[in-house]
Amino acid sequence: MSRIGKKPIPVPQGVDVKINGNVISVKGPKGQLEQEFHQDMNIKLEEGNLVVERPSDAKDHRALHGLTRTLLNNMVEGVTNGFQRNLELVGVGYRAAKQGNKLVLTIGYSHPVEIEPPAGIEIEVPAATKIAIKGSDKQAVGQLAANIRAVREPEPYKGKGIKYENEIIRRKAGKAGGKGKK
């Protein structure tokens, strides 16, 4: 049995779970999430816990078992506490600002880059070089953070660009030759 899949998911107070066939809807203080799961996985609500069961020990069912449980846990966690991803801007003159709902990045291009967050995702700019992305959907928060980072990925020579908060950029040495040649 999958070690992750067999763990029950505790449903906290104030979180409402609706099971309609293979479509699960979770509603909590931070919002509502709905997702369709594989029809082979059997999801039940027993004594305040969500339990995922699989029909057989086939390889694909074992893989889906852990995946389904983790996705359900992320849904419950998201509507209860929410998820946050932090980004940092490294570079002279690199700034982030918020205009209404949009994020405006000044990162060395000839034009400012504007990014509109999807519904249910909130962008905060606590400092000119810091960005915080918050939301109840873990996948959407992570995807938006990856899209913002992709606008100007950190380069290996000076480390300039947009990086995740605790990301370590592997640095390279610059050109060594060319000093004594004429």
UniProtKB/Swiss-Prot annotation:
Please give the superkingdom of this protein's source: Bacteria
Sections of the chain in a coiled coil: none
GO MF terms, alphabetically ordered: rRNA binding; structural constituent of ribosome
How far does the signal peptide extend, from start to end residue? none
> Among its keywords, does the record have Plastid?
no
Gene designation = rplF
**Family recorded in the similarity comment:** Belongs to the universal ribosomal protein uL6 family.
General function of this protein: This protein binds to the 23S rRNA, and is important in its secondary structure. It is located near the subunit interface in the base of the L7/L12 stalk, and near the tRNA binding site of the peptidyltransferase center.
User: Which GO cellular component does the record give, naming just one?
Assistant: cytosolic large ribosomal subunit
Quaternary structure and partners: Part of the 50S ribosomal subunit.
User: How is this protein named in the record?
Assistant: Large ribosomal subunit protein uL6
Do you know which PANTHER family this protein is assigned to? 60S/50S RIBOSOMAL PROTEIN L6/L9, LARGE RIBOSOMAL SUBUNIT PROTEIN UL6M
Cell cycle among the record's keywords?
no
Instruction: Tell me a GO biological process for this protein.
Output: cytoplasmic translation
Keyword line = Ribonucleoprotein, Ribosomal protein, RNA-binding, rRNA-binding
